[in-house]
Amino acid sequence: MHIIFYGPEGSGKSTQAKLLSEKLKIPALVSGDLVRKYAKEDKGIMGDACREVFKTGHYVADSEMFVLWKHRLKEPDINNGFVIDGFPRNLDQVKFLEEKLDKYQKKEDIVFFLKVSEKESIRRLLKRGRKSPDGSLHDTPEKIKERLRRYKKEEKQVLKFYKKRGLLRVINGEQSIEEIHDNIMGIIKKYE
């Protein structure tokens, strides 16, 4: 299966992606992990771009995300399926992902949208207190609100695209981790 988790930061995408990855025994491809890996390990232009993201609190530019994902989608561990978290974030990224998945004879089976309020996203992110690789606080209230504003601008188009394709499944992301996982597994079982 090829599954995408979509939703604002703090909606629980990473938690659910990792749970589902373990349950289905397929890799979780986490956008943030890719960025952190390049920020830590890459000494070139891509590493610099990823490190800058943590300093500014902005997203990685589409062109740079495309490079990261192009390399990741070629790796053989995803041949039997995957769970994606944190990508795509906008319609250009959706189209890029579609093109790459077609090239590798794969396609999305389900897109889970974890729906949470802005207030809940902010609460969770502040509680998490995520730090950048350099140790500085990445999740300040101002940075969080700015990222959520940018996310909201793109959300409607992305959801419309996946809904039109019949792939979108909306999950109440304000439930417990276990309740969300149970809802997801209930949907997954219909595809087996």
What role is predicted for each listed range?
Residues M1-E192:
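Glycine-rich phosphate-binding loop of ATP-dependent small-molecule kinases
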